[in-house]
């Protein structure tokens, strides 16, 4: 009986220690998540790892212009598009 109760106390102690360690690790992760607000360090914070905000790029631009060949779409797509296609009668401009 005494060996069983010692094993239970030991097991309970290990469980409590593991729980405390996991809670402290979760608290540290929560602190790191709020370092950057809007891509900048909040006031009072010195060591932030804020990455610059990147503007989204438009990969595909679909016009409402009808077409029969790819060459017809060149005049409707913005300059600098790498791929200009006539796709099922609609001009598609890609990688602009």
Curated annotation (Swiss-Prot):
Its main location: secreted. It is found in: Secreted. Keywords: Antimicrobial, Disulfide bond, Fungicide, Plant defense, Secreted, Signal. GO terms for biological process: defense response to fungus; killing of cells of another organism. GO terms for cellular component: extracellular region. Belongs to the DEFL family. This is Putative defensin-like protein 263.
